Amino acid sequence: MPVFLRRLLQSISAVLSVLALAAGLPLAAQDDITTQDATSGYNGVFITGPSSNPLSFLNGAAARTTGNPAPYDFHDFAPFTYIDSKLPKWIDVQGEERFRYEGYDNSNLKLGVNDSYLLNRFRLQVDLRAASWFRVTAQVQDARSGLQNPPIGPPNTVRWDLKLAYAEVGDPEKHWFSLRVGRQLINYNNTIIANSEWRNQARSYDAAVLNLNAKREHLGIFAASPVVPQAYGVSPHQEGNNIYGAYGRIDDLVPHSNLEPFFLWRVQPAEVVEPARAKTTGHENEKAAGLRFKAQAFKSLDYSGEVIFEGGKVGPEAIRAAATQAGAAYQFLDAAAKPRVFAQYDFASGNSGPATNGVHSTFDTIEPTAHDRFGITDLFGWQNLEAVRAGTTIEPHRRLTFTIQGLDFWAPSALDSIYNTSGSSIAFNKTDHGHHVGAEVDSYSWYELNKHFNLGGGAGYFGAGEFLTNVTTSHSYTTYYFALNFKDNGKK
């Protein structure tokens, strides 16, 4: 039996035994279908723009906490739904098209490294349903850039790739049991494992996912390997780069709430041990355990909190890291333009002595979302970072929203690196020049034309603090974008 599947079966057996003994609860699934549209609003949220399923509903208009019942200003256009209606009942077709123009000045805080370009992404999906409890899904994706400075390739250009290819027994939305095997999306928790939809190619996993559902208890158990995008042909996954995990959800312990305990185990054959010190790599065996709580009160107040602890070993160093986040949002439903104010705090540990202490205490964000995790400039990842966010969203017209937000960033360790969303080092100080990384202000807007089309745009500016001004050639970064999105699920 392949090692990948053997470890999945071992994980399933161990987790089921522990949960059955410790909780005595019926087991159920946290399903990636029900969470792929966002995971942090209570019972999911409605995405109005192409933001990459942002960390939380606190991020403003890109994620509504409820679907908007207001009528649209434009008539619907759904060609795949029409085609689907003419096909046999056991065939479903879906289509997506996304255009985005984006640009930036001073990439990675390097003076004069500027670019602007067009992005296009097309997806075509076919579902074959042999029975109500069995289906086979395939999706092809063509992602390309235009007018971009070289080199041209991933993540913006990945031509005619196989985005999805899986078989599924059971329906996770209807049945207590389902098993999906093949190339698929996994998006249980945007903070640490997600499909990162904002990127032009996004992220897929070659995986086996077992989902178990009861009335209030849900459990997903999975073994997965992230796909490494290639410019041409079918992209492979990286052998040995595997994630195993169990992600649970218990509903309504407090009215209108979700409690989500989870455990992840990640192994990699070669991971950089201390990016702030050298590029030396070593084998990684990392375990992460966490708990997230999210809830809604009085229809107007949303709040959430999360804590994650990491242990294990990377190269010769022991892993001891942690992260947490908490936030709240309140919407004035009876006021003009329905203003919604939000605030959020994030912390991820860093390494106070990367050259000397022999312990890897920089938090590993594993496979997170890449957009609006910490503002729309997308400069930083959840590693050696302390961030405060506050902002407001207004809705001056039905299905039209405007958001403005500000963020302030600090480095818990002045001697560790500051990291980007992929976990690579942007800059680090050999001596302590201060902890303030900088501040950011963003503004963006989304408008839903009809059920299948939306458009939006935004701009963000970041100004560097003393942590960066001593080691970067630019002390500011600017980004901007305009996007048009079409998605027709074509469901009968």
Regions found by a protein language model. Give the residues of each.
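Flexible, solvent-exposed coil segments and beta strand-coil junctions
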Residues: E102-D105, A143-Q148, Q184-T191, F222-P229, ...
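Signature for the C-terminal beta-barrel architecture of outer-membrane proteins
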Residues: W133, E173-L179, N195-T356, E395, ...
